[in-house]
Amino acid sequence: MKLIEFGSRHSFYEWFRRCDRSDNYPLINFNYIHCWEEDTHIYRCVEKGKDVGVIFISCCYPGEMWIDLFEVKKGKHRTGIGTKMFRLLMEKHTPLYVKLECVEEEDKEKEAHHFWRKMGFHKTYDRTVLGDAFVKTYTKKYWKNYDKL
């Protein structure tokens, strides 16, 4: 498996528009408010010539990484791909702290939360976000001290 970094956000969006990928990931509205483009990194995760995942990170502060998107292709969950992706990411970036928000979606959150706990993350706080009048989304933020990997 290898991580292929997009040269810019523009090339990432062009890749989505061209459909030059083996899976149709949803185009997510990333939060760029606090980061310059040079502080963000977007990776395609490729195994045997096929896309198996996408990672989007922000490194706005020294020694800190924020995982904005960490997605394994549908149908590839629980096969070890996410663990490989995370280890490759940590080889490329060696932050002191890694932060992320893990959204709860009914039964799906159990799988995602289990994965991040397995990677050594710990819950640091909860907060409630109201989408529209009908939807409540719960998020959890995790941190990890890289020295304990």
Predicted feature residues:
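A short helix-loop-beta-strand connector motif used in the catalytic cores of GNAT acetyltransferases and
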Residues: 33-44, 66
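Conserved beta-strand in the GNAT
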Residues: 44, 50-59, 64-71
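Conserved acetyl-CoA-binding loop-helix of GNAT-fold acetyltransferases
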Residues: 72, 78-91
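Conserved active-site alpha-helix within GNAT-family acetyltransferase domains
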Residues: 104-126
